[in-house]
Amino acid sequence: MEPLLPTPPLLLLLLLLLSSSFVLPAPPRTPRHSDGTFTSELSRLQDSARLQRLLQGLVGKRSEEDTENIPENSVARPKPLEDQLCLLWSNTQALQDWLLPRLSLDGSLSLWLPPGPRPAVDHSEWTETTRQPR
């Protein structure tokens, strides 16, 4: 019996696969400007995160010390709850008075002008002389 030899296309494919495994590694990539930009931005963000953790730690320690030093019989302000109503807006009459539209100088409605006396002159003389006819 004769040994089976691979057919020519299979032999070529085998040689191609074997030769590609001996390829030299790619040369090192040249540094780019974007690499430096990314690195500096990353280090800036890391520094910012470190500073934020430090501040949170300091504030947390300080608040823990404050709660430890408060005597039990002292009057301490309770922490506000999320479902509490803001007392500034509990006076609905004052809120409605503030939101009512007010008349501006030319008689149109305006939310921005405060209530009070209006000037006797609607327009100055300078305004009248510089006004262009429509």
From Swiss-Prot:
Principal subcellular localisation of the protein: secreted
Q: Which residues carry this modification: Phosphoserine?
A: S63
- Report keywords, A-Z: Amidation, Cleavage on pair of basic residues, Hormone, Phosphoprotein, Secreted, Signal
Query: What GO MF annotations does this protein's record show?
Result: digestive hormone activity; G protein-coupled receptor binding; hormone activity; signaling receptor binding
Q: What PROSITE patterns does the database record attribute to this sequence? A: GLUCAGON
UniProt note on tissues of expression: In the brain, expressed in the central amygdala, hippocampus, area postrema, nucleus of the tractus solitary and cerebellum. Expressed at higher level in the cerebellum.
Pfam families xrefs: Hormone_2
Localization in the cell: Secreted
| Propeptide residue interval(s) | 22-31, 63-134
Where is the PTM Valine amide found along the chain?
V59
| Position of the signal peptide | 1-21
Please verify whether the record's keywords include Signal.
yes
Gene Ontology biological-process annotations? adenylate cyclase-activating G protein-coupled receptor signaling pathway; brain development; dentate gyrus development; diet induced thermogenesis; embryonic digestive tract development; hippocampus development; intracellular water homeostasis; negative regulation of gastrin-induced gastric acid secretion
GO CC annotation terms, alphabetical: extracellular space
What PANTHER family does the database record attribute to this sequence? SECRETIN
User: What's the stated role of this polypeptide?
Assistant: Hormone involved in different processes, such as regulation of the pH of the duodenal content, food intake and water homeostasis. Exerts its biological effects by binding to secretin receptor (SCTR), a G-protein coupled receptor expressed in the basolateral domain of several cells. Acts as a key gastrointestinal hormone by regulating the pH of the duodenal content.
Give the family per the record.
Belongs to the glucagon family.
The molecule here is called: Secretin
Source organism of the structure: Rattus norvegicus (Rat)
Q: Which gene encodes it?
A: Sct
